[in-house]
A protein has these predicted regions:
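Short beta-strand/loop motif that positions the catalytic acidic residue
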Residues: 113, 119-121
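Alpha/beta-hydrolase-fold enzymes
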Residues: 1-77
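Catalytic active-site module of serine/aspartate enzymes centered on a nucleophile-bearing elbow/loop
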Residues: 134-184
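Long, compositionally biased charged/polar accessory segments in the mid-to-C-terminal portions
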Residues: 83-85, 89-90
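Acidic catalytic loop of the alpha/beta-hydrolase fold
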Residues: 77, 96-97, 123-128
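Short alpha-helix in the alpha/beta-hydrolase fold that links the catalytic acid
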Residues: 102-107, 129-140
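Short, conserved loop/helix-junction motifs that constitute active-site signature segments
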Residues: 110-114, 141-143
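Active-site nucleophile elbow and catalytic-triad environment of alpha/beta-hydrolase enzymes
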Residues: 73-74, 90-109
Length: 184
């Protein structure tokens, strides 16, 4: 995704304020990223190999498939509400972040934390797999922390938490209620 922004001539080394923004690069970065936000099953159900506005292949370079049109739409929406440099810094910060690095282990990183935790994962999330969530839960429990964990069976991928997901809402509401009862 970052390379798409870097290769946009309007990026200008990040100094595009006051000029044309690198909308093509940012839109393409969003399109690339968006593919990982949905599960394979949801992508297949929603789009499959269906064509957008035709019954037969056009054998050209236009956006023929529904998935192409959807991804273009997502890219256009994104550039209207997000800044390319912000995208670059956020994604780079995610790459650099390693909680274990400064502490030697996850358990050591959580040792001094006094808060209770609620960890929720989704079976179809490719970006934050359930196994990573379970690793965090094991580390929290290893250092005696109170942690609730729920793995939600879902076919909607990383975006599940953005959708109308009653199970996620219920888990968060119950956790917050318990925290209010505990702490007032």
């Amino acid at each position: 995704g970052r390379q798409a922004i870097f290769r946009d001539p309007s990026w200008n080394g990040g100094d595009y304020y006051g000029g044309k923004k690198p909308e093509d690069g940012l839109g393409l970065a969003r399109m690339i990223g968006h593919i990982t936000y949905m599960s394979e099953r949801l992508m297949h159900e929603k789009f499959g190999r269906r064509l957008q506005n035709a019954d037969l292949f056009g054998f050209n370079f236009e956006s023929e498939f529904m998935v192409e049109s959807y991804l273009h739409h997502q890219g256009i929406k994104f550039v209207n509400r997000f800044d390319a440099n912000s995208y670059l810094y956020i994604t780079k910060a995610i790459d650099y972040f390693d909680l274990k690095a400064d502490y030697g282990s996850l358990a050591a990183a959580f040792e001094k934390v006094t808060a209770d935790f609620l960890i929720i994962s989704y079976t179809s999330d490719w970006l934050y797999p359930s196994e990573q969530a379970r690793e965090i839960v094991r580390a929290l429990r290893a250092c005696g922390k109170h942690v609730g964990y729920t793995e939600i069976e879902s076919d909607t991928g990383h975006d599940t938490f953005l959708l109308d997901d009653r199970q996620t809402q219920r888990n968060i509401a119950n956790f917050l209620r318990s925290q209010f009862e505990k702490h007032g």
